[in-house]
Amino acid sequence: MLMSLSRRELIKKEIFDIEEYVPGRSIEEIASTYGLKPESIIKLGSNENPLGPSPKAVKALIEAAPGANIYPSADAHELREALSKYTGFPVSNIVASGPGMDGLLDGLCRIIIEKGDEVIVPIPTFSYYELPARACGAEPVFIRRNQDFSLNPEKILEAVSPRTKIIFLCSPNNPSGNLLPEADLRKIIENTDALVFVDEAYVEFADRNLAALVNEYDNVAVGRTFSKVFGLAGLRLGYGIMPEWLTKEYLRAATPFSVSLPALRAGLAALSDTEYLNKSINLAREGREYLKEKIPFKVYPSQANFVLVDVSPLKAKKVTESLLKKGIIVRPCDSFREAGDSFIRVTVGTPEQNEKVVRAFEISKSEV
């Protein structure tokens, strides 16, 4: 006898609680909306590397194309070995993930979270964390950051319950760009049995990282990506650094072949091009200081490849609209939970792009 199920009833109830992820707007969309030529548009809304990928990575992509009919290694072992040299951690502490760090988050939630669990998310921050958590049945517990976007470890620990499985932290934080102090992270790790996940997507641009704590504690994992400093956002490649026990369980349930052959080859080449890596880092560090000094609004200090601009008393949407009409894509932060309506995130571009965005902010300030 057939059961009478509506199509909606086929979907897990938790899915309907998910707020769809809002990405940065594309060049094609803005060109079509505002009648602009695509080549005239400056895209500074998604924290991409304005220099593009390393030429070595591009060459590796081209050379990998004829082998697209062959499966890559199931666990991307060759890339994990290269990441071991890059990070200083044994291969047994490293996993590679596609699509990007998002795939790592999906995998961790899949092996850790059960229906009725909780995850803790200090906000505003990267909004993807709650998506895989909710999809797996967890309830996010949101903790408001301080006025300067720093964390209050005591508030986070007060929110920990027997149902808490993962605490999501971001350093440098997106969209604010500030680092998580090591002392605060230690305090959180040492006072919970939950997994503490540290998102270091932008860490190459920062003065320090927190990955060494993986050697000291068995309940901390670090996520990283090739999308930012390595300029491979379109290939969706990420990796995790975690205790050996967690690596083992992650690989047990991981999607095999999740890292495509082109992504694997490009990742290997990008890791080998230290000159290009340093060039990208220096461009971002110099550019963020220029933007902080020149943009005619309050700009927060940043350790990432972007800056956060407070345009109050103006509204971010109106200023963003003014910039879009001038062919400059930036990111209004109203899609970040509890970020408010006066913040705009601006990716560091080339020196020429940075000059144009500063001038556009100056004009928009008088127009809006």
From Swiss-Prot:
<dbReference type="InterPro" id="IPR005861">
    <property type="entry name" value="HisP_aminotrans"/>
</dbReference>
<dbReference type="InterPro" id="IPR015422">
    <property type="entry name" value="PyrdxlP-dep_Trfase_small"/>
</dbReference>
<dbReference type="Pfam" id="PF00155">
    <property type="entry name" value="Aminotran_1_2"/>
</dbReference>
<keyword id="KW-0808">Transferase</keyword>
<dbReference type="GO" id="GO:0004400">
    <property type="term" value="F:histidinol-phosphate transaminase activity"/>
</dbReference>
<comment type="pathway">
    <text>Amino-acid biosynthesis; L-histidine biosynthesis; L-histidine from 5-phospho-alpha-D-ribose 1-diphosphate: step 7/9.</text>
</comment>
<dbReference type="GO" id="GO:0000105">
    <property type="term" value="P:L-histidine biosynthetic process"/>
</dbReference>
<keyword id="KW-0032">Aminotransferase</keyword>
<dbReference type="GO" id="GO:0030170">
    <property type="term" value="F:pyridoxal phosphate binding"/>
</dbReference>
<dbReference type="InterPro" id="IPR015424">
    <property type="entry name" value="PyrdxlP-dep_Trfase"/>
</dbReference>
<comment type="similarity">
    <text>Belongs to the class-II pyridoxal-phosphate-dependent aminotransferase family. Histidinol-phosphate aminotransferase subfamily.</text>
</comment>
<keyword id="KW-0368">Histidine biosynthesis</keyword>
<feature type="modified residue" description="N6-(pyridoxal phosphate)lysine">
    <location>
        <position position="228"/>
    </location>
</feature>
<keyword id="KW-0663">Pyridoxal phosphate</keyword>
<dbReference type="InterPro" id="IPR004839">
    <property type="entry name" value="Aminotransferase_I/II_large"/>
</dbReference>
<protein>
    <recommendedName>
        <fullName>Histidinol-phosphate aminotransferase</fullName>
        <ecNumber>2.6.1.9</ecNumber>
    </recommendedName>
</protein>
<dbReference type="InterPro" id="IPR015421">
    <property type="entry name" value="PyrdxlP-dep_Trfase_major"/>
</dbReference>
<keyword id="KW-0028">Amino-acid biosynthesis</keyword>
